[in-house]
Amino acid sequence: AVEAFKLARKYGNAADKLFINDYNLEYSIDKCKGLIEYVKYIESKGQKVDGIGTQMHITINADKEKIATMFQLLAATGKLIKVSELDVAAGLKPTQSDLQLQADMYKYVAEMYAKYIPAKQRYGITVWGLIDSKPDSSWLPGQNQGLWNLEFTRKASYSSFADGLKASK
């Protein structure tokens, strides 16, 4: 990674922001801490890391306390923080209760991002797969993880996520 950052700085646009990105940081706080230590290592070798990205492919039952802890740890780095991928799987045949839990989780993630990541460190949230996955999809086949259903109708998760994003203003 040290060499990758060195070459990106040398040959890339001087204004580019360079991120290190990983997944499951909200599931494993030790992994999150390890990534933060890795950033420190890269920087100890003379290369600047502008930001940290987290891929959050979570479920309606994700551990909310760990999500909050992850954002707190990432914020403490002083780096730009981006949720580079976010989806919340509600299962193959979700009930109305499951869909409400999904909506609540999308909102929770946006609210915790706004609560713990200072405005100057926020680099955004990218939703991964806006619509639910088709049964033959290569990503979460048949899951109901999107903000829209397969008929492109907004789900409760759409409004809840939007409400959560309002917390960042």
How would you label these PLM feature ranges?
Residues 1-32, 82-85, 124-130:
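Aromatic-lined carbohydrate-recognition surfaces of secreted/lumenal glycan-active proteins
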Residues 1-11, 34-45, 104-116, 120:
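An active-site-proximal structural segment forming one wall of the substrate-binding cleft
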Residues 3-12, 41-46, 51, 58-59, ...:
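Extended low-complexity acidic/polar segments
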Residues 10-11, 15-22, 35-62, 67-92:
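Aromatic- and acid-rich polysaccharide-binding/catalytic face
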Residues 26-27, 58-59, 98:
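A generic structural signal for short
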Residues 65-169:
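Aromatic-rich peripheral "rim/lid" segments of glycoside hydrolase catalytic domains that contact
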